[in-house]
From Swiss-Prot:
It catalyses: dCTP + H2O + H(+) = dUTP + NH4(+). Catalyzes the deamination of dCTP to dUTP. It comes from Pectobacterium carotovorum subsp. carotovorum (strain PC1). This is dCTP deaminase. The keyword Hydrolase applies.
Amino acid sequence: MRLCDRDIEAWLDDGRLVITPRPPTERISGATVDVRLGNQFRVFRGHTAPFIDLSGPKDEVSAALDRVMSDEINLPEGEAFFLHPGELALAVTLESVTLPDDLVGWLDGRSSLARLGLMVHVTAHRIDPGWQGRIVLEFYNSGKLPLALRPGMMIGALSFEPLSGPAARPYNRRQDAKYKDQQGAVASRIDKD
């Protein structure tokens, strides 16, 4: 059962759930909290690699990822990031989220943006119990027109679901947690699997 607006506010009030900066009441609806777009992005460089062998040796996968992913782009205030049709880009929420060990979060895109072809997460929309950090967004433009994305715009909504008990292996205590405390648009770390 997902938390309703009253429960979300109660969890925020007593510090079990932390969202920084804390969202105002008008950004908390019946079962979700609106999140905004941050100013950090990462894109694929122009490259000549015919493919990335995801099951290949880790050092080769790592080298291939380094060749195709850009450095992080920090967009100055007031500027837009243009996502063209058929392009994938990584971005990050403005808000940082900390979940307790007995709560899982879910990220959903906004319907109004989806109707323009913008996918906010390609497949990864679960936020693990024990998560702490900003949420990376996997943008894909499946529409026909370039989309101007501006830091601070409402980009998605989080919902929260209590677990039957505290997780034995929450994300923040796992030794293999690849994105622990992430604050920027971190590229894939599949080579760390």
